[in-house]
A protein has these predicted regions:
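Alpha-helical transmembrane segments of multi-pass membrane proteins predominantly involved
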Residues: 1-510
Length: 510
């Protein structure tokens, strides 16, 4: 985590002191190098605690245990893929108006310029590259690493803000459809500020109840209390609002479709995967470490949230006509599926959620990476489903890869999604949540319809006369898509090594 923070600060210094022409290479090298070094550090720490559940660190505000390390490793792997997509700077084909037809640079050359203004067109013609996105991404990654490892609520809130603030900025930096991007950033910021306020108010209530912000101290206070727990339950509910907002669970999901659609697609890919991983890690730690004694009170609430999330996500996705919005509602539905593992409240439930987050993170990055390649003649992303007709016929490789990710989301056998859903449903069934499993299976069947609909559209429908083009990416995006597709297939065919790793990380430090 300190490696990532150091890289983020160094990235800010690069922006301040390095010539513009040298920044891109320096920022990319620094971001990738720091992320890979952080992965190596996680591996070293894991090897140093063979028979140990975990230990506190940083004066007890952070805990280093196996679930935290698993989640941090997953976030860092997803971050590497996200940085590859964010770094894509495919050379555009110049057009008469200074546009970038065929180019894959997702970020505006001058964020402060009014969309469509002369200043923006001049910056585009000059080939100005937005390199501030790299330190912003690294700050977001640092917050994500801290969020699931925080051992007190104040540290958790700080992590929440550190991961959120850079994402608010990144969402508003799209090169094309600037107004839509800025609208998405504003919505995300306003709703995110409200959710953070709810979280902080809940922290204050739990502090008033327990007299401590430490998660284990809160657990001890609840266990020793023989009176009313209404203050603790109210605080828990408010904290739950803040965390469920980040995972995109209903009814706190309204920001997801607009933000996923308006944000630059590489940012959407990174945010959709990494934020969900970090937020679910924090949710698990809160309920499994601080509030296990209140399980009879919070489980019914999560039951309702999980069912509502699965229903809203799947039913609304069926009606979508935009690929990015369809994937956004798919992400909402997957939050409901993951919540079934959280509700299990047992060690298989924890390990199944860890596996699901790993598999889902890779598939999500890959799916959005493919979306970023489909462009019209002016270089705009083509996300209307009708424009994807015949895409698989014209480019079988791209169609096949995107179909693989959709089949994984649907939970089809021999993909990572099947193993993920089977694991969480099995754990929920063992935890007594059979009705929830039934709802999950039905929701998965409904979800399969809109995934297969896109596959049929790509391979069995005639393309339009002015069909969109597939932009050939550089090695950065190609590497990201290749790795995510390989992992999606590998976890479907040979999931046991990762399942064993997740089973070894199925216990928090209490």
């Amino acid at each position: 985590m300190l490696i990532v923070v150091g890289a983020a600060i160094a990235g800010v210094l690069i922006e301040a002191f390095l010539p513009r022409r040298s920044r891109y290479a320096a920022q990319l090298t620094l971001a990738l190098g720091a992320t890979v070094a952080a992965i190596a550090a996680v591996v070293v720490v894991v090897r140093q605690m063979p028979g140990e559940i975990g230990r506190p660190a940083v004066m007890g505000s952070v805990v280093i245990d196996r679930p935290a390390l698993f989640l941090q490793g997953t976030i860092l792997l997803v971050a590497v893929l996200g940085i590859l997509l964010i770094a894509e700077r495919q050379i555009p084909v110049n057009t008469e108006n200074g546009g970038a037809a065929g180019g894959l640079d997702a970020f505006t050359p001058q964020a402060s310029a009014v969309p469509g203004s002369v200043a923006e067109r001049v910056a585009t013609r000059a080939g100005v590259a937005q390199t501030e996105v790299f330190p912003l991404t690294m700050f977001a990654v640092a917050g994500m690493l801290l969020f699931p490892a925080a051992d007190d609520l104040l540290t958790m809130f700080i992590a929440l803000e550190v991961l959120s603030l850079p994402l608010y900025l990144l969402c508003g930096l799209a090169r094309r459809r600037r107004l839509l991007s800025q609208e998405a950033a504003l919505k995300y910021f306003l709703l995110g500020a409200f959710s953070s306020a709810f979280f902080l108010y809940g922290v204050a209530m739990l502090y008033g109840y327990a007299g401590t912000l430490d998660l284990r101290g809160i657990a001890a206070a609840v266990a020793e209390d023989t009176g009313t727990t209404s203050l603790a339950l109210t605080g828990t509910g408010l904290i739950l609002v803040g965390v469920l907002f980040k995972v995109g669970a209903a009814p706190f999901h309204s920001w997801i479709p607009d933000v996923y659609q308006g944000a630059p697609t590489p940012v959407t890919a990174f945010m959709a995967a990494a934020t969900k991983i970090a937020a679910f890690g924090a949710l698990l730690r809160i309920f499994y470490v601080a509030l296990p004694e209140l399980r009879d009170d919070w489980r019914p609430v999560l039951w309702a949230v999980a069912i509502l999330t699965m229903v809203v996500g799947t039913v609304t996705a069926v009606t979508q006509t935009d690929v990015k919005r369809m994937l956004a509602y798919s992400a909402i539905a997957h939050s409901g599926f993951i919540l079934t593992g959280v509700i299990a409240e047992n060690r298989p439930g924890l390990s199944s959620v860890l596996f699901y987050l790993f598999a889902y993170g890779f598939s999500t990055v890959g799916a959005f990476a493919v979306v970023s390649l489909v462009r019209d003649a002016d270089g705009q992303e083509e996300t209307a489903m009708t424009r994807w007709a015949g895409l698989g016929r014209r480019n079988p490789l791209v169609g096949a890869v995107f179909s693989l990710f959709l089949l994984a989301f649907a939970g089809i056998p021999l993909t990572s999604g099947f193993v993920s859903k089977f694991a969480v449903f099995k754990a929920a069934g063992e935890g007594g949540a059979i009705p929830l499993v039934v709802v999950g299976v039905i929701a998965s069947a409904v979800a399969a319809y809109f995934y297969v609909r896109v596959i049929v559209l790509m391979f069995f429908t005639d393309p339009p006369a002015d069909a969109p083009q597939i932009v050939v990416p550089s090695g950065l995006t190609t590497a990201a898509v290749t790795v995510t597709a390989a992992v999606t297939l590998a976890l479907g065919a040979l999931p046991q090594p990762l399942l064993d790793l997740a089973n070894g990380a199925d216990q928090f430090l209490h």
